[in-house]
Amino acid sequence: MPGKIAVEVAYALPEKQYLQRVTLQEGATVEEAIRASGLLELRTDIDLTKNKVGIYSRPAKLSDIVHDGDRVEIYRPLIADPKELRRQRAEKSANK
């Protein structure tokens, strides 16, 4: 008989952070943890088909199994390409 596990689900914005603790059955997935957290209803900007997810800063898939004590993280999409930003900074410093 599977037991219960406790998992945290985190989502951070520049102005506010969300951290929800949920209790799930052993063998639950990342997606089940996110859905159980209620964050999808609270934040309509989260789209699991677009937002990447991870467990303790390591990339994960929605189908990955979570373990007791895990922190599932929902990442916001990048608003700018990091390579492009570095190129722009390099050009700016070269022009000084």
From Swiss-Prot:
Any single Pfam family the record assigns to this protein: Ub-RnfH
Record gene name: pasI
Domain of life where this protein originates: Bacteria
Organism field: Escherichia coli O6:H1 (strain CFT073 / ATCC 700928 / UPEC)
Role this protein plays: Antitoxin component of a type II toxin-antitoxin (TA) system. Unlike the case in E.coli K12 high level expression of this protein abrogates the toxic effects due to overexpression of the cognate toxin PasT.
Protein name according to UniProt: Persistence and stress-resistance antitoxin PasI
Residues annotated as transmembrane: none
Gene disruption phenotype: Deletion of the pasT-pasI operon causes reduced infection of the mouse kidney but not of the bladder. On rich medium operon deletion decreases bacterial persistence about 100-fold. Forms small colonies on rich medium. Delays growth on minimal medium supplemented with threonine, increased sensitivity to oxidative and nitrosative stress. Growth defects are complemented by low levels of PasT expression.
InterPro entries xref list: Mopterin_synth/thiamin_S_b, RnfH, RnfH_sf
